[in-house]
A protein has these predicted regions:
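Short, amphipathic alpha-helical interface elements at domain boundaries
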Residues: 2-65
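Minor-groove-contacting beta-hairpin "wing" of winged helix-turn-helix DNA-binding domains
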Residues: 90-95
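Short amphipathic alpha-helical interaction segments
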Residues: 62-81, 88
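Short, solvent-exposed secondary-structure capping/transition elements
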Residues: 30, 85-89
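Short, amphipathic alpha-helical interaction segments positioned at domain boundaries
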Residues: 3-5, 79, 97-115
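A generic structural signal for ordered alpha-helices
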Residues: 51, 55, 61, 72, ...
Length: 115
């Protein structure tokens, strides 16, 4: 039997935010290992310019990233064990469970870049 899609019942904004956070964890310039959780601490959330912002080699539309500035979304991810508390809105830890969670929408919101 295949695994259930979205078993923690994240809403669309939470799924988008987690997808972006997962991608941000691959950037060694803004991350560090969190010894307490075994996860990855993001210590630099990129700022949008115009209608998008860059996440490594990918581009995210600003409209898909509103959860990065929504404390309620961060708290929901913490409650569900996908993140650990950081300093909103500057840093957050993506736990091993969060790193491995299949949001199913990664390719819908993370686009290739042409500049």
């Amino acid at each position: 039997m295949p695994p259930k899609a979205n078993p923690l019942k994240l809403n669309k904004l939470q799924l988008k935010t987690l997808s972006i956070l997962q991608e941000l964890t691959s950037d060694p310039g803004i991350t560090e290992r969190d010894e307490v959780t075994g996860g990855t601490r993001i210590i630099g959330i990129p700022a949008p310019h115009g209608n998008h912002f860059h996440v490594g080699a990918r581009v995210v539309m600003s409209s898909d990233a509103t959860g990065l500035n929504n404390e309620g979304v961060w708290l929901a991810l913490v409650r569900k064990g996908l993140a650990a508390a950081g300093v909103f809105p500057f840093s957050i830890v993506v736990t091993p469970a969060g790193l491995g969670y299949d949001t199913g929408i990664r390719d819908q919101i993370l686009h290739g870049t042409d500049h």
